Swiss-Prot record:
Main localisation: cytoplasm
Organism: Coxiella burnetii (strain CbuK_Q154)
Residues bound to GTP: 17-24, 85-89, 139-142
InterPro entries for the chain: EF-G-like_DII, EFG_III/V, G_TR_CS, P-loop_NTPase, PrfC, RF3_C, RF3_dom_3_sf, RF3_GTP-bd
Protein name, as recorded: Peptide chain release factor 3
Gene that this sequence comes from: prfC
Highest rank taxon of the organism: Bacteria
BP terms from Gene Ontology: regulation of translational termination
Matches recorded under PANTHER family: PEPTIDE CHAIN RELEASE FACTOR RF3
Length: 525
């Protein structure tokens, strides 16, 4: 099959939500509808602990939050879907942000009782920057919820995006009876308790069908009146607005009961964009180009406790990956052979024989691959727009057993390569300082150091409030700066000079004193 045909059948997207809106449940149900798993909730770990397929790291299982981005591929009808599960917890902004650079569209999950929550607002800002098309699933309709019109108003006013309802709920909570599909003019009736298997919902054709009155009684005429109001007050779905990220189609349902998910998935494969062109520092790369290219948006250490491995997740931007092919690693200016790239089904990994634009493959990484790296078939361009953020929180890392210094350094280096934490090594001392965007990161690192590297560490406070990357073209100025400010300077994991400011005032004074130097909050990988 040609590159064009392979590209056209693919959909690569991420699910975004506030914690507890039901993102992991919906992820699992999408896999269920795609036939990737047979029974919901039955994927067991060796200890037979029940946990959702996509939250596969020990700490995630204990805490019930998605800590790292998981990649899952599954077929649905004539399509192949690549689903990137993003961390729902507030501390994992960076990882989520980078994941959103690797997708062509997003699915937003909203809890019908809570509406728009802070984390959703933050993620929407990222999507807006990239004009990412967004579909919305309003979940938990089987519980007591806020009025649906109110939820739409809130999405429009807070997230600044037009809402186009595609399905509309009939009742809510105990009185939830189903959904009306505005485009199909059909009603799907709700039967609670279908948690584990996918079954066909009973369907009634036409809102004016007398059969509806038999099934719903007085609710039928209420529904007809409500739909008239909804059609008058909301935007009709139009694909162009959706693809520009200006309008979001809205679907209602109950993911835990498998209800409303099929309608969402059908609309998704039909309307969501296939893999799109990608910007580089020299030109736009189109997916249908013959030559292979791709970029690394995430690195994950120790995905399989049985193998001490690091996997670099690469999004294919153009051409075809074939097992054993040679690819050019642009940053290192050298050709490498890729023999054993992986594809993923949440923790189940298989060797990829081939992969196409939109697919995510895993490359075994022995420390040479970094986030943001570009691979091509000889061309020397670099994909742009994969950011690194300055840390906001800092801790000094101390060993409980001083003899484990080497293992500590190895662990911290490998874990910081994943991009969720940053390791700083001060110029003036042998201290190790860990920086993160959120507090939970420190717990994750301590937990993983102990479990994956057999190193116990403790944290101490350190006199650093923020970090800035130091950029200066004038070597003489930079040398003078290094000498005068060495006590506040460190190298990050990538060997980039960083200023660790003991206070905001100190940073402002230093920036004023050194106008030739750029103090940057973000850095492109």
């Amino acid at each position: 099959m040609s590159v064009e045909k392979q590209t056209a059948m693919r959909r690569t997207f991420a699910i975004i939500s506030h914690p507890d809106a039901g993102k992991t449940t919906l992820t699992e149900k999408l896999l269920l509808f795609g036939g990737a798993i047979q029974l919901a909730g039955t994927v067991k770990s060796r200890k037979a602990a029940r946990h959702a397929t996509s939250d596969w790291m020990e700490l995630e299982k204990q805490r019930g939050i998605s800590v790292t981005t998981s990649v899952m591929q599954f077929p649905y009808k004539d399509y192949l879907i690549n689903l990137l599960d993003t961390p729902g917890h507030a501390d994992f902004t960076e990882d989520t942000y980078r994941t959103l650079t690797a997708v062509d569209s997003a699915l937003m999950v909203i809890d019908a009782a809570k509406g728009v929550e802070p984390r959703t607002i933050k993620l929407m800002e990222v999507c807006r920057l990239r004009h990412t098309p967004i579909m919305t699933f309003i979940n938990k309709m089987d519980r007591d919820t806020r009025p649906s019109i109110e939820l739409l108003d809130e999405i429009e006013s807070i997230l600044r995006i037009h809402c186009a309802p595609v399905t509309w709920p009939i009742g809510m909570g105990k009185y939830f009876k189903g959904i009306y599909h505005l485009i199909e003019d059909a009603i799907y009736l709700y039967q609670p308790g279908k948690h584990e298997r996918v079954g066909e919902s009973e369907r009634i054709e036409g809102i004016n069908n007398p059969e509806l009155d038999k099934k719903l009684g007085d609710l039928a005429s209420e529904l007809r009146n409500e739909i008239e109001l909804v059609k008058g007050a909301s935007h009709p779905f139009e694909r162009e607005g959706y693809l520009k990220g200006e309008l979001t189609p809205i679907f209602f349902g109950s993911a835990i009961n498998n209800f409303g998910v099929g309608e969402l998935l059908d609309a998704f494969v039909k309307e969501a964009p296939p893999p799109q062109g990608r910007e580089t520092n020299s030109r736009l790369v189109k997916p249908e180009e013959e030559k292979f290219s791709g970029f690394v948006f995430k690195i994950q250490a120790n995905m399989d406790p049985g193998h001490r491995d690091r996997i670099a997740f690469l999004r294919i931007a153009s051409g075809q990956y074939q097992k054993g092919m040679k690819a050019y690693h642009v940053r290192l200016k050298k050709e490498i052979q890729i023999n054993n790239a992986l594809t993923f089904m949440a923790g189940k990994r298989e060797n990829a024989e081939e992969a196409w634009p939109g697919d995510i493959i895993g490359l075994h990484n022995h420390g040479t691959i970094q986030i943001g790296d570009t691979f091509t078939q000889g061309e020397r361009f670099k994909f742009t727009g994969i950011p690194n953020f300055a840390s906001e929180l800092f801790r000094l890392v101390r060993l409980k057993d001083p003899l484990k210094q080497k293992a500590l350094l190895k662990g911290l280096t490998q874990l910081s390569e994943e991009g969720a934490t940053q390791l700083f090594r001060p110029l003036d001392s042998n201290e190790l300082i860990l920086g993160a965007v959120g507090l939970l990161q420190f717990d994750v690192v301590a937990y993983r150091l102990e479990n994956e590297y057999n190193v116990k560490c403790v944290y101490e406070s350190v006199n650093v409030v923020t970090a800035r990357w130091v950029i200066c073209d004038d070597k003489a100025v930079l040398e003078r700066f290094n000498q005068e400010q060495s006590r506040n300077l460190a190298y990050d994991g990538g060997g980039h000079l960083t200023y660790l400011a003991p206070s905001r005032v100190n940073l402002e004074i230093t920036m004023e004193k050194w106008p030739e130097i750029q103090f940057s909050e973000t850095r492109e990988h």
